[in-house]
């Protein structure tokens, strides 16, 4: 049941693009799925490599940003950031931390 619940949460966040909301809060997800903080944390620990909620959402945002830069090279970095729920400076910082290059460097190699 727990894995199914995590997959339902993950699918909803991705399909409905909840990750793109700048003000998305853990409480929004908890309320929507009728679970408490501890239960959500347990799900993330078990099925999202132990990531915290902000880390989990950022990982989805970064994955989507990378996909957008590949599939829509005409988009500016600011456009990509807006579409995935980051500010441009935050996308730059988080992207570099995860992938070892800036979004601009990544785009230049595509």
Where are these regions (language model features)?
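The alpha-helix within a helix-turn-helix
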Residues: 30, 41, 80-81
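N-terminal positioning helix adjacent to the helix-turn-helix/winged-helix DNA-binding module
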Residues: 1-9, 25, 58-61, 73
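A secondary-structure capping/hinge motif
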Residues: 44-52, 95-106
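Residues within helix-turn-helix
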Residues: 27, 38, 75-78, 89, ...
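Basic, amphipathic alpha-helical hairpins
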Residues: 10-24, 44-48, 66-75, 95
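Terminal helix-turn-helix DNA-binding modules in bacterial transcription factors
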Residues: 47-83, 109-110
């Amino acid at each position: 049941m727990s894995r199914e619940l995590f997959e339902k949460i993950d699918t909803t966040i991705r399909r409905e693009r909840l990750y793109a909301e700048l003000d998305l809060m853990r409480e929004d997800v908890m309320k929507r799925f009728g679970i408490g903080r501890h239960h959500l944390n347990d799900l993330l620990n078990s099925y999202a490599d132990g990531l915290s909620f902000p880390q989990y959402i950022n990982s989805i945002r970064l994955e989507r940003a990378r996909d957008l830069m590949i599939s829509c090279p005409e988009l500016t970095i600011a456009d990509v950031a807006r579409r995935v729920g980051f500010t441009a400076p935050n996308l730059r910082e988080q992207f570099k931390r995860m992938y070892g290059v800036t979004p601009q460097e990544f785009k230049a190699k595509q």
